[in-house]
Amino acid sequence: RILDIDLYLHATKEDVFFEDDKEIGMISLRVATSMDIMSPEGVANSGRMENSAGGINEDEIWGKQAHWCDYSGVVDGKMVGVTLFDYDENYNHPVRWHARNYGLLTSNPFSTNCFNPELPKTGYNLKKGNSLIFKHRVYIHAGTTEEAKVVEKYQNYINPPLITIK
């Protein structure tokens, strides 16, 4: 299954400032608890996160830039997953990811310092009368990241086939 989500932000009455904060995201998901990487009690679970940069799970993904991030795990005895794709023309692409082993995954285009204190504070000021568009694809799949051909599906998203009608 594929969902394409286009988010249009327009500052109609005044400037809108998006803080450099890990809680700001343009698209988020929570997976079934059986897909969590760690249970709330700290017990290893069936889940696994992977991103386009080769990062695995929270320690290697949280706050890092990537074109996409996949969360896979077992639901009702079957390996399934969901991938968030960040469109290559989005502001601050590739985004940083607020990714947690307890099942949370969020793309965050506005923040740097909250993820890495050595980087400058950023944020974004959307001026009155201006707009900002974010495009994302949600890919819901069977199998692991590799089995679901996530890399190929991302390439299809950013380089769609050209169709000529004669």
Sequence positions of predicted segments:
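Beta-strand elements of well-folded, non-transmembrane domains
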Residues: 9-13, 31-35, 138-142
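Asp-box/BNR beta-propeller blade signature and adjacent active/binding-site loops
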Residues: 1, 35, 78, 103-109
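Solvent-exposed loop and beta-edge segments used for protein-protein assembly and interaction
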Residues: 1, 21-23, 128-132
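Intrinsically disordered, low-complexity acidic/polar segments
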Residues: 16, 38, 143-147
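Beta-strand-rich recognition/accessory modules
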Residues: 83-166
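Beta-strand secondary-structure signal
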Residues: 4-8, 28, 133-137
